[in-house]
C-alpha cells in the first residue's frame, strides 16, 4: 500500500479503511482512520430475509447495498476510502497473510466448495473498492494452512487432518501478546485458543500454526455450536442406523 498525500500534496494523512465481516445472521462493518475505529455497525438479517435466497452467494448484491446504505446514512463517502478489507472465506488452503482480491480469488470465493457467509466478505469488499477506486483485501481466512506434515496424520490414511481454524483472531491475539511482552511473534512458541460458537486450539511455532483442530467440522473441544470430537464407534453406528442423512449427521457435529 502507498500512503496517501494530503490535499496539499505534502506530508501524509491516515488511511481510511472499511472492514466488512459477513456472518450467518448479520453483516458487521467498521471504519478506521489508521488503527482508530470511527464507526462500528451491526446490520441484522432476519430469517425471513435470508430465506429469500436459495444460496448464500445470492445474497451478495443485497448485503452490499445494505452496507452502502448504512455508510450513506452516516454521511460517509466511499470515495474517501484508502482500502476495503473483508472477512476471508472457505477458499483453497493458503498461508497466513493479507491477500488482494483479484480474479483468481474472486473465482475461489464464488465457487467455494462449502457455503458460508464468510465467502461474501472479499466479494462485497471488492465491489465497494471498485466503486471507490481502491483495492480490496482479505486477511488470514479460516483456511490458513501452515501445518507440519506430522500434524496431518490420522489413524486412517484416507482421513488426513486438515487446517480450518479461527486464524484471523488467533494470529491477531498472538501478535498482540508478542507486542505486549516486547518480542516478535516469529520468535515465540505459543498455544492460542479461540473460544466462541466454535473453539479452536492451536500450536503457534515461530509465527506458524503447526497444529490445530478442524473447528469448522466440530473436531476438538465441545463448543456452543460444535459437538467436539465424539466417540468414533458411536458415530459410525449413528451414521448407519438408517435414521439420519449425511446432512443430518453433519448438522449434529457442527
Describe each model-derived feature in a short phrase:
Residues 17-58, 215:
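Short glycine-rich, Thr/Ser-proximal phosphate-binding strand/loop in the N-terminal lobe
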Residues 32-37, 96-108, 134, 152-157, ...:
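A glycine- and small-aliphatic-rich helix-loop capping segment at beta-alpha/alpha-beta transitions
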Residues 117-127, 138, 145, 153, ...:
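Glycine-rich phosphate-binding loop plus the immediately following alpha-helix
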Amino acid at each position: 500500500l502507498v500512503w496517501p498525500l494530503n490535499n496539499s500534496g505534502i506530508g501524509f494523512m491516515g488511511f481510511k479503511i472499511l472492514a466488512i465481516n459477513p456472518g450467518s445472521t448479520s453483516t458487521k462493518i467498521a471504519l478506521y482512520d489508521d488503527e482508530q475505529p470511527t464507526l462500528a455497525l451491526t446490520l441484522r438479517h432476519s430469517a425471513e430475509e435470508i430465506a429469500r435466497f436459495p444460496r448464500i452467494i445470492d445474497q451478495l448484491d443485497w448485503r452490499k447495498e445494505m452496507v452502502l446504505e448504512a455508510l450513506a446514512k452516516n454521511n460517509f463517502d466511499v470515495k474517501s476510502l484508502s482500502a476495503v478489507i473483508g472477512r476471508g472465506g472457505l477458499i483453497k488452503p493458503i498461508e497466513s497473510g493479507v491477500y488482494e482480491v483479484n480474479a483468481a480469488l474472486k473465482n475461489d470465493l464464488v465457487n467455494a466448495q462449502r457455503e458460508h457467509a464468510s465467502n461474501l466478505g472479499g466479494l462485497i469488499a471488492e465491489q465497494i473498492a471498485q466503486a471507490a477506486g481502491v483495492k480490496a483485501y482479505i486477511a488470514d481466512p479460516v483456511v490458513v494452512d501452515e501445518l507440519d506434515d506430522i500434524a496431518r496424520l490420522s489413524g486412517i490414511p484416507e482421513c488426513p487432518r486438515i487446517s480450518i481454524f479461527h486464524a484471523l483472531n488467533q494470529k491477531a491475539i498472538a501478535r498482540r501478546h508478542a507486542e505486549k511482552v516486547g518480542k516478535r511473534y516469529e520468535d515465540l512458541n505459543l498455544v492460542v485458543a479461540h473460544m466462541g460458537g466454535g473453539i479452536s486450539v492451536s500450536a503457534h511455532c515461530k509465527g506458524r500454526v503447526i497444529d490445530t483442530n478442524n473447528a469448522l467440522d466440530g473436531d476438538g473441544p465441545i463448543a456452543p455450536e460444535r459437538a467436539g470430537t465424539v466417540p468414533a464407534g458411536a458415530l459410525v453406528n449413528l451414521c448407519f442406523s438408517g435414521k439420519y442423512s449425511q446432512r443430518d449427521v453433519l448438522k449434529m457435529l457442527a
